[in-house]
Amino acid sequence: MDGTETRQRRLDSCGKPGELGLPHPLSTGGLPVASEDGALRAPESQSVTPKPLETEPSRETTWSIGLQVTVPFMFAGLGLSWAGMLLDYFQHWPVFVEVKDLLTLVPPLVGLKGNLEMTLASRLSTAANTGQIDDPQEQHRVISSNLALIQVQATVVGLLAAVAALLLGVVSREEVDVAKVELLCASSVLTAFLAAFALGVLMVCIVIGARKLGVNPDNIATPIAASLGDLITLSILALVSSFFYRHKDSRYLTPLVCLSFAALTPVWVLIAKQSPPIVKILKFGWFPIILAMVISSFGGLILSKTVSKQQYKGMAIFTPVICGVGGNLVAIQTSRISTYLHMWSAPGVLPLQMKKFWPNPCSTFCTSEINSMSARVLLLLVVPGHLIFFYIIYLVEGQSVINSQTFVVLYLLAGLIQVTILLYLAEVMVRLTWHQALDPDNHCIPYLTGLGDLLGSSSVGHTAAVPRRCTASPGWGLIQPFICTQHLIVSLLSFYFPFCLLAKTSI
C-alpha cells in the first residue's frame, strides 16, 4: 500500500509510545512528494521531528507472536506437505511424463501464486493495521482494485513463466513442439488466473475477519495463503494440463484460452485504476515479480532434471515443503517490518533504530526490538516444523520416503540456513526499499520468495543425494555430511553477496 494513505489511529486504551518501549512515530510535517518513477519521498525542506501523538503501537510479546504464528504456520505446513505428496503423485501422470517442461513450470507458477497472494496479504494487512479498510466505501475500493491488480499480474506473469520454462527446456533439449508450447502456455495462464482469484478472495476474508477479531493479520494471512495456495495451484495445474492433454486434437482450444484471458486484461486494468497506489504498482511493480519468476524458474529446472533420477529420490516431495516454509516465514517477517515502517515513519525516512542499511546479524535476531523478537520466533519454528512435516509425510508415504539420519540432519540444517539468510535479507531489503521510498510489500516479498525457491530446490538436491553415497562408501559417509554442509553454506552465501553489491549500487 502507498505511504500517502497511511493513517495512524488514536486509541484510548493505548499508552504512549515511550511507555511501551517503542520509538516515537516520525512525521515529515506534510505529505510525501511523488517522484517521476512513482516513488514517494518526503519533502527535503521538512525536518523529521518526533510526533507527540498517541498511536496504535504493537503490544505484542514473544509469546503472543508465537501463539498467533504457530497455528497458521502448522496449518500451512500441512498444506505444503500434501502439496509435496501431490507433486510426487502428479509427476507420473501422462501429461507430466510427456511434457517435461510442466515440472519446470511448478516452482515459478507456485512461486507466482505466493508472490501475488503474499504481497496482496501484506498490502491488505498494512491497510487493516493502519485503519484504511475500516470505512466501508474505502474498503470496497481497496479490495476491488487489489483483486483486479493480481488478475493482471497473474495473466501476464503466468504467460511469461511458461515462456521461461520453454526457453530453459529448449536450451537443455534443443527441440520445440508447437502443440506442447500451446498446452504449456494455456495451462500456465488458466492456472494462474484461477489460483489468483480463489486465493485473493480468501485473503480478503481472512484479513477482514482478523481485523474484526482483533488479531494481527500480518501473523496469519500469509501462512494461511501458503497452506492452501500450493495445494490449490498444483491441483489446478494438474487438472487443467491433463484436460488440455486429453483434448490435444482440438487445434484451436489452447490458443483461444490464451487470447480470451489476454482480452480480459484491459478490464482488470480499468478496475485497478480506481486506486492511485495500485496505478503506481501497475506502472512500476512488474520488475520484482518478473525477476522472482525468473529466479524460481531455475529452481524448476533443477527439479525437472533431478525428480526422475533415483539418486535424487525425495525431490518431488520435499521441494514444495522447504521452498514453501522459507517463503512463508520470510513473507511474514517482511510484512511485519513493512507495517511497522508504515505506522512509525514516512516513505524515504528510516526510524532512528533502523538507520543502518546493513545491520549486524546479531541485531536482527538478538535484540529486544519487536522485529527482532518476531525473527527469533520465526527462526525457532523451522526445525520443529520441518520435523513434524517430515513425520507426517513419512506416515503417509511409508518406505518410499528417504528416512536416513544423514538426510534428516542435513535437510533440517539446510532449512535452518535458508530461513536464517532469508530473514536477514528481509531486514536489509526492507530498509533499502523504504529508504528509496518504495513499498516493501510490493518490492521485497517477490525477490525473497523467489530466492527461497532457488535455495530450497538446490538444498534438497544436495541433501537427497547424500544417503546413497553414504551407502555406497562407508568411509565417504563419515565425511560427506560435513562436506555437504560446507557446500550448502557456500552455495547459499553465493546468492547473498551479489545481492549486496547490487543493492549498494542502487543507493
From Swiss-Prot:
<feature type="transmembrane region" description="Helical">
    <location>
        <begin position="152"/>
        <end position="172"/>
    </location>
</feature>
<keyword id="KW-0812">Transmembrane</keyword>
<dbReference type="GO" id="GO:0005886">
    <property type="term" value="C:plasma membrane"/>
</dbReference>
<dbReference type="GO" id="GO:0005743">
    <property type="term" value="C:mitochondrial inner membrane"/>
</dbReference>
<dbReference type="InterPro" id="IPR006667">
    <property type="entry name" value="SLC41_membr_dom"/>
</dbReference>
<keyword id="KW-0496">Mitochondrion</keyword>
<keyword id="KW-0460">Magnesium</keyword>
<dbReference type="Pfam" id="PF01769">
    <property type="entry name" value="MgtE"/>
</dbReference>
<dbReference type="GO" id="GO:0061768">
    <property type="term" value="F:magnesium:sodium antiporter activity"/>
</dbReference>
<feature type="transmembrane region" description="Helical">
    <location>
        <begin position="406"/>
        <end position="426"/>
    </location>
</feature>
<feature type="transmembrane region" description="Helical">
    <location>
        <begin position="314"/>
        <end position="334"/>
    </location>
</feature>
<comment type="function">
    <text>Na(+)/Mg(2+) ion exchanger that acts as a predominant Mg(2+) efflux system at the mitochondrial inner membrane.</text>
</comment>
<feature type="region of interest" description="Disordered">
    <location>
        <begin position="1"/>
        <end position="60"/>
    </location>
</feature>
<feature type="transmembrane region" description="Helical">
    <location>
        <begin position="189"/>
        <end position="209"/>
    </location>
</feature>
<keyword id="KW-0472">Membrane</keyword>
<feature type="transmembrane region" description="Helical">
    <location>
        <begin position="252"/>
        <end position="272"/>
    </location>
</feature>
<keyword id="KW-0999">Mitochondrion inner membrane</keyword>
<feature type="transmembrane region" description="Helical">
    <location>
        <begin position="220"/>
        <end position="240"/>
    </location>
</feature>
<dbReference type="InterPro" id="IPR045349">
    <property type="entry name" value="SLC41A1-3"/>
</dbReference>
<feature type="transmembrane region" description="Helical">
    <location>
        <begin position="377"/>
        <end position="397"/>
    </location>
</feature>
<dbReference type="GO" id="GO:0045016">
    <property type="term" value="P:mitochondrial magnesium ion transmembrane transport"/>
</dbReference>
<keyword id="KW-0406">Ion transport</keyword>
<dbReference type="InterPro" id="IPR036739">
    <property type="entry name" value="SLC41_membr_dom_sf"/>
</dbReference>
<feature type="transmembrane region" description="Helical">
    <location>
        <begin position="284"/>
        <end position="304"/>
    </location>
</feature>
<feature type="compositionally biased region" description="Basic and acidic residues">
    <location>
        <begin position="1"/>
        <end position="13"/>
    </location>
</feature>
<protein>
    <recommendedName>
        <fullName>Solute carrier family 41 member 3</fullName>
    </recommendedName>
</protein>
<keyword id="KW-0813">Transport</keyword>
<feature type="transmembrane region" description="Helical">
    <location>
        <begin position="482"/>
        <end position="502"/>
    </location>
</feature>
<keyword id="KW-1133">Transmembrane helix</keyword>
<feature type="transmembrane region" description="Helical">
    <location>
        <begin position="67"/>
        <end position="87"/>
    </location>
</feature>
<comment type="similarity">
    <text>Belongs to the SLC41A transporter family.</text>
</comment>
